[in-house]
Design a protein with these regions (language model features):
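A donor-sugar binding/catalytic signature common to diverse glycosyltransferases
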Residues: 92-129
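Active-site regions of enzymes building and remodeling cell-envelope glycoconjugates
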Residues: 1-3, 73-86, 135-139
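Conserved mixed alpha/beta catalytic, RNA-binding, or beta-rich assembly cores of soluble enzyme
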Residues: 6, 11-12, 43-44, 67-68, ...
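C-terminal amphipathic helix plus adjacent low-complexity
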Residues: 158-196
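A nucleotide-sugar donor-handling region in carbohydrate enzymes
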Residues: 1-43
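Catalytic donor nucleotide-activated moiety binding site of glycosyltransferases and closely related
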Residues: 51-83
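Short, acidic/turn-prone active-site loops that include or flank metal/cofactor-
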Residues: 2-5, 85-89, 122-127, 145-146
Length: 196
């Protein structure tokens, strides 16, 4: 009753010093879609418009460009931080107020942690695992910036609820991991018993 991300998130120990590396305590993460991928035919990135709207609404943005050229999207944006070095993506998810990404893994990680998660995946179809998270209400999907901003406004209340009890997402991941380990142990025991 979980996702592959639950299994490895269960063992993650968030770095309590992560926020010390950022210029702000509250932020949303923006990770561009992979416009250069073969499964994306002729689509334009929504990130330039999304960054402008987030900036206008007063959000602090941790921007994680995929390509060097993605850095151009940040020109003129005031409340944005682009790390010079790679950051721990799991810590970025754990401490974020929301994740907005064109990448599936980060959106799923956030959803599993209980962090408001927005996917603006640019492919023709969502992966079935992402669609199941959307159907369960754990992830929001849209490539329409106005819809994304509206979702964020409605999700704002949960930003602070999550921060107050953020460990709940990790506890759920640990429960999923334990269920998997229990099933594996049962299967191994049954196999070993059949070999005697």
């Amino acid at each position: 009753n979980g996702y592959k991300e639950d299994f490895y998130l269960a063992d993650n120990q968030p770095d309590s010093a992560f926020l010390d590396k950022l210029p702000f305590e509250h932020y949303v993460v923006v990770r561009p879609e992979n416009i250069k991928a073969s499964y994306v035919e002729g689509r334009q990135s929504i990130v330039p418009e999304l960054l402008k709207e987030l900036d206008a609404a007063g959000y602090n943005i941790l921007f994680l460009p995929r390509y060097e050229s993605d850095r151009d999207y940040a020109q003129g944006i005031k409340n944005i931080y682009m790390p010079k070095e790679a950051v721990n993506g799991l810590d970025a998810c754990y401490y974020a107020d929301a994740i907005l990404t064109g990448a599936g893994t980060m959106a799923r990680e956030a959803a599993c942690l209980g962090v408001p998660s927005v996917s603006f995946f640019a492919g023709a179809h969502l992966l079935s695992v992402d669609q199941s998270l959307v159907d369960a209400g754990k992830m929001f999907f849209s490539r329409d910036v106005a819809q994304i901003m509206q979702y964020l406004e409605h999700a704002k209340d949960s930003f602070f609820e999550y921060r107050a009890g953020g460990i709940a997402g990790l506890e759920r991941c640990k429960q999923v991991q334990q269920e998997i380990l229990d099933v594996l142990e049962q299967q191994i025991r049954a196999y070993l018993k059949s070999q005697n």
